Amino acid sequence: MESQQLHQNPHSQHGSAYASVTSKEVPSNQDPLAVSASNLPEFDRDSTKVNSQEETTPGTSAVPENHHHVSPQPASVPPPQNGQYQQHGMMTPNKAMASNWAHYQQPSMMTCSHYQTSPAYYQPDPHYPLPQYIPPLSTSSPDPIDSQDQHSEVPQAKTKVRNNVLPPHTLTSEENFSTWVKFYIRFLKNSNLGDIIPNDQGEIKRQMTYEEHAYIYNTFQAFAPFHLLPTWVKQILEINYSDILTVLCKSVSKMQTNNQELKDWIALANLEYNGSTSADTFEITVSTIIQRLKENNINVSDRLACQLILKGLSGDFKYLRNQYRTKTNMKLSQLFAEIQLIYDENKIMNLNKPSQYKQHSEYKNVSRTSPNTTNTKVTTRNYHRTNSSKPRAAKAHNIATSSKFSRVNSDHINESTVSSQYLSDDNELSLRPATERI
């Protein structure tokens, strides 16, 4: 009889289960399974509703109302300590200053429906149940900075976040992530959060607060859909769902790598060599550029490298262009060997040039001072040298020599006069002297 009654009333099971959670006692003389939900008194149904609401566990108010199923609640788990947050750390609430954008730390302010199905982000809707393995941000966790140095002071933000900052555009594809992250970093800098963004070396100026962490996390997930992120970004977030700083740090590093690739291509295309530096230095410079490009999955063939090098050769190395013009199989090592050979030959010639010049100069000096020289050009120049060009000492010497010569001539004339007079006296001849002394 009872089985037939249950079969006829399919809702009787639900009614009995619904009544079992109430605080209303069922009379012991009546089988509770035999009483259908429709036969309960009106006050019993009201008390059942009230008591079922009172016995609801704390925390289920955030879950959408469901009378037939109660969602499991997430366990209280401290924030993840893996990833880069062991190094960077976050400030405790007593260190964090009162933020003017505190409402941005509420996930409900950044509602985005397509993130509700992604396991790598904690859900932006506070009414959505969180998975057990994704803990939310908690301000009661121990600060790793306090465990190291309790008296250390961390710089805090002193400016307010601007309210009229232009938000970044939404990421549209995985290939555009490198471009999108530039706009996102600019967005954070315009929001006065540039001092917590890692630089090229992965260093930051100060530690971020919990409010700033939530602000960065929520804005990142709002404008970057998870299914459009690159694989390396997904791998980071799967290890630590909130480690946005590591993503930004590696993004900056990749941007620097891309800039370095461009610089290397420009340097390789503008190579110049004229022998002013050693051939070894030139070879090391070119090889370093080619190796750096190879590490970034950019292979430079020997033929292309030889063509770029030959284009920049000048001076004594220029003739190598004609030598390699007809070659089809160019080897970079062979080209470097020939450049080294020319450089060594020029170096030997430059070392011999000063000694040859010195010997030639000494030969010229000897020919000028030798008395037996046959250089008519030197003799003519010295013979016609005027007294006006002589130095003052030479002029005085010439004057003294000329006066001495005149005195010698006058003495000779006097002696001849006396001898002539003596001859005339002996021969008794009267002769007229040739000269008279004045």
UniProtKB/Swiss-Prot annotation:
Cleavage (site feature) positions: 397-398
Keyword Ribonucleoprotein: no
Species in which this protein is naturally found: Saccharomyces cerevisiae (strain ATCC 204508 / S288c)
Gene Ontology CC: one annotated term: cytoplasm
Stretches for region RNA-binding: 295-397
Region Disordered, annotated ranges: 1-89, 366-438
Annotated gene: TY2A-DR2
Pfam families, alphabetized: TYA
Compositional bias ranges of the Low complexity kind: 369-381
Protein name in the entry: Transposon Ty2-DR2 Gag polyprotein
Bias (Polar residues): 1-39, 49-60, 399-408, 415-424
Domain notes for this protein: The C-terminal RNA-binding region of CA is sufficient for all its nucleocapsid-like chaperone activities.
